[in-house]
Amino acid sequence: MLGMIRNSLFGSVETWPWQVLSTGGKEDVSYEERACEGGKFATVEVTDKPVDEALREAMPKIMKYVGGTNDKGVGMGMTVPVSFALFPNEDGSLQKKLKVWFRIPNQFQGSPPAPSDESVKIEEREGITVYSTQFGGYAKEADYVAHATQLRTTLEGTPATYQGDVYYCAGYDPPMKPYGRRNEVWLVKA
């Protein structure tokens, strides 16, 4: 676990592969259109809890799996970003449902260790194309909602189309990183 934290703080962390297809923006909001590679992901779903509380429940389970709480007892190392899906209601508020996605490192993609915790699932996920915007700080539910709204507004009047029933939030930094934090909101291209 200490090795994962050290790597997260000092830069030797595997990044989820993607390709920037285009960039754009309006006023103070910029975005990238990215093609993100698919693969195998460790997932945890939490329902009936607000986003921040659901993350506090799900993230330790993912971290334990990555850190070696699996059938092989092997620590896999981190990949970034860790992403999670949010499900908006028609009024913009969020459903009490969250799904965390952690892309399994490349060296374990062929045969990922089986989770010891039954709430952690391994899922094959197709590649996706997203519209992504970035922001800093310690992100909370209100920040993700605000940045998703800003990104939607920025995409108005462009040819961009995206799914309205889900969006992803992504974090690149361990909780103890005090500054230079990177968070993103992704709208999935329709």
Curated annotation (Swiss-Prot):
**What is this protein's name?**
Heme-binding protein 1
Record family assignment: Belongs to the HEBP family.
Kindly indicate whether the keyword Cytoplasm belongs to this entry. yes
Q: Which UniProt keywords apply?
A: Cytoplasm
What gene name is listed for this protein? Hebp1
InterPro entries xrefs = Reg_factor_effector_dom_sf (IPR011256), SOUL_haem-bd (IPR006917)
Q: Which GO terms describe its molecular function?
A: heme binding
What does its UniProt record remark on the domains? Forms a distorted beta-barrel structure, with two helices that are packed against the outer surface of the barrel. Porphyrins are expected to bind to a hydrophobic patch on the outer surface of the beta-barrel structure.
Q: How does it assemble?
A: Monomer.
Q: Which is a Pfam family this sequence falls into?
A: SOUL
Q: Which organism is it from?
A: Mus musculus (Mouse)
